[in-house]
């Protein structure tokens, strides 16, 4: 059994991790922690997230010193803010743990990226070099031996799963940048209260136009520029992305379908649509990314859906852990 610590367990993604790890036959939860200053310290996880009542009734322990929790721990999931993960990950690695970080702290190997988009100076360039980007379907070989896994962002997961096989397959005319219009539920903004996320305020609105940190994350890992516009929708969870691309002259519907099938035909957590395009309701609460597309002449529209808290966060983290330790990829997920 892998002794597993979940840091930042009080949040939405943290609670999903608790659920997955609790039912994993090869993992056991050693502790659930929050920051020492958290108002949730000392509360039961099941009081904050009642869906866990009678299933996981562990307390949220305040953590001020990593050494109090790292002994005999094999796996650490960090469901923490970017700056917090930046500080904690090196300490857990030093203690011999394998770290799965759900924040953006180690996703891009460029210190200037963090100053520009995250507002802090990255102190661990050697870990940026070592970190493996956890886009699970595409990085299996590297994940097998990784000790620091940077779980991709929610928007970048759906965008890259949609575009990577098309770009790598040489089907797109990249002189016209792919345009990604993405809408996420309010849970993507986290559990902390904010006026902009309150019931009476939330509507349907773009945000972070030309400035969102997920745009460079997508572009860096695709090796191609994109235009990315996120939107906040008036629903709790899930992401739908509509991606408009130009195909190279002569590329057919059948070629697009073939490239996607070759990429994901044996990938259990990506579901391809033979006809039509996916709806959000079919992935909420599930660990899948659903992908469908339509072609008209040289124009291609790809639609991808996922649960932002699952395939966009907790489920992909556990999927990466399954790959890292040689378990079935879908263990505890489906």
UniProtKB/Swiss-Prot annotation:
Keywords: Amino-acid biosynthesis, Arginine biosynthesis, Cytoplasm, NADP, Oxidoreductase
E.C. number(s) listed in UniProt: 1.2.1.38
Pathway: Amino-acid biosynthesis; L-arginine biosynthesis; N(2)-acetyl-L-ornithine from L-glutamate: step 3/4
Class of this enzyme: oxidoreductase
Pfam families, per database record: Semialdhyde_dh, Semialdhyde_dhC_1
UniProt signal peptide: none
Catalytic activity of the protein: N-acetyl-L-glutamate 5-semialdehyde + phosphate + NADP(+) = N-acetyl-L-glutamyl 5-phosphate + NADPH + H(+)
Cellular-component GO terms for this entry: cytoplasm
Coiled coil: none
InterPro entries: AGPR_AS, AGPR_type-1, NAD(P)-bd_dom_sf, NAGSA_dehydrogenase, Semialdehyde_DH_NAD-bd
Any one GO biological process: L-arginine biosynthetic process
Chief localization: cytoplasm
GO molecular function per UniProt: N-acetyl-gamma-glutamyl-phosphate reductase activity; NAD binding; NADP+ binding
Active-site residues, Swiss-Prot/TrEMBL: 154
Subcellular location: Cytoplasm
Keyword Oxidoreductase: yes
Membrane-traversing stretches: none
Family: Belongs to the NAGSA dehydrogenase family. Type 1 subfamily.
PANTHER family: N-ACETYL-GAMMA-GLUTAMYL-PHOSPHATE REDUCTASE, CHLOROPLASTIC-RELATED, N-ACETYL-GAMMA-GLUTAMYL-PHOSPHATE REDUCTASE, CHLOROPLASTIC-RELATED-RELATED
Function per UniProt: Catalyzes the NADPH-dependent reduction of N-acetyl-5-glutamyl phosphate to yield N-acetyl-L-glutamate 5-semialdehyde.
Name listed for the protein in its UniProt record: N-acetyl-gamma-glutamyl-phosphate reductase
Organism: Salmonella typhimurium (strain LT2 / SGSC1412 / ATCC 700720)
Gene from which this protein is expressed: argC
């Amino acid at each position: 059994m892998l002794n597993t610590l979940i840091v930042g367990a009080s949040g939405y993604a943290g609670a999903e991790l608790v659920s997955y790890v609790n039912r994993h036959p090869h993992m056991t939860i050693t502790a659930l922690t929050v920051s020492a200053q958290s108002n949730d310290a000392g509360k039961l996880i099941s009081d904050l997230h009642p869906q866990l009542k009678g299933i996981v009734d562990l307390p949220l322990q305040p953590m001020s010193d990593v050494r109090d929790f790292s002994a005999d721990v094999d796996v650490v999931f960090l469901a923490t803010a970017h700056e917090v993960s930046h500080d904690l990950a090196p300490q857990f690695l030093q203690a011999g743990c394998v770290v799965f970080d759900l924040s953006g702290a180690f996703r891009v190997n460029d210190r200037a990226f963090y100053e520009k988009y995250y507002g802090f100076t990255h102190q661990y360039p050697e870990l940026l070099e070592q970190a493996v980007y956890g886009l699970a379907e595409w990085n299996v070989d590297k994940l097998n031996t990784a000790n620091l896994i940077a779980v991709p962002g929610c928007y970048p997961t759906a965008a890259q799963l949609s575009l990577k096989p098309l770009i790598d397959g040489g089907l797109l005319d990249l002189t016209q940048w792919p345009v990604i219009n993405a809408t996420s539920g309010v849970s993507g903004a986290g559990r902390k209260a904010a006026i902009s996320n309150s019931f009476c305020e939330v509507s349907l609105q773009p945000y972070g136009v030309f400035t969102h940190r997920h745009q460079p994350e997508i572009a860096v890992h695709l090796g191609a520029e994109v235009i990315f516009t996120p939107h906040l929708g008036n629903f709790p969870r899930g992401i739908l992305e509509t991606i408009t691309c130009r195909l190279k002259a002569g590329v057919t519907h059948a070629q697009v379908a073939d490239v996607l099938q070759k990429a994901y035909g044996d990938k259990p957590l990506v579901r391809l649509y033979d006809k039509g395009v996916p709806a959000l309701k079919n992935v909420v609460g599930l660990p899948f990314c659903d992908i469908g597309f339509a072609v008209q002449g040289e124009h291609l529209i790809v639609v991808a859906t996922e649960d932002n808290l699952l395939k966009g966060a907790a489920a992909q983290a556990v999927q990466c852990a399954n790959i890292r330790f040689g378990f079935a990829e879908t263990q505890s997920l489906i």
